[in-house]
Amino acid sequence: MNTKLHPEDRAGHFRSTSPCSAIIDEGEGVIVIKPSNKIGRLGLPQVWESKHLLKYFVLRSIRGRYRPTTMGYGWIIFRPLLLCLVYVGVFGYMVGVKTDPIPFPLFVFLGISLYLFFSGTVSDTASSLINNAGIMSKVYYPRLIVPLTSLFVNVMDLLASFVVIIGLMLIYGVYPGWNVVYFPFFLGGLALVSFAMGLILAAHSIERRDIMMALPVVMRVMVYAMPCVYPISMVPEKLLPLYYMNPMASLIQGIRWSLLGEVAPPWWSVGSAAVLLIIGLYYGLIAFTRDERTMVDSL
């Protein structure tokens, strides 16, 4: 038997099934469903409800990236290893950069792995909407899943690189101290800052395609704006306050300090990085969800 619900009944029905939605009856049978709180407006509950879809997209992206290649998943390790050999040859032997007591190959491989994670997360997240325009125009799902997929794919690559990093630490006899307890916080901060930057660029690149043209150049320059291939001791002391205003510099140096026992970043720079992280992530989510309704038409 078919039952036709009146607007009042439908409102009551929907109100009980969606804790993150508010039902507003505007009269004449028109019912508007809106998020009932700020978290709902950011789209986070919808992403959690569709976490199985996020897992599917992540696995599909990883397979699609590496399976068609000859080396397959070996590229996850070979790419940072190849760059590491180049920088060790240039900075270690030609320039003579010293990172004592940390062996230079371990120093560079950790820095390159972190840089590739940062660069990959920002670039992939920024271009995720444009690259997935086809499926987004045909099927509805929480759009935030698209940039989150880019984040988690790069997280998986970074975790694979850390297997090599741990191996190098064992080979060279480098062991972390008590400050390793801060490692997850610095690494999580790096991931969230990278995602926030990519999310902001993704929201604005739909209307401003010049962003995607300039982004590869900016990412190549950023490797020298962070302590990835050179020690922090090479930065002139009078420029250190300006240098640490870059949140990526303090986060990467914090990872080096917590894992390898290098010089700790100033705590004021860590605090400023945390503030910028919160502001950037919130703004990125707001900008993304604000344009979510119209982004498909603009792609």
Regions found by a protein language model. Give the residues of each.
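Hydrophobic transmembrane alpha-helices and immediately adjacent juxtamembrane helices
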Residues: 2-299
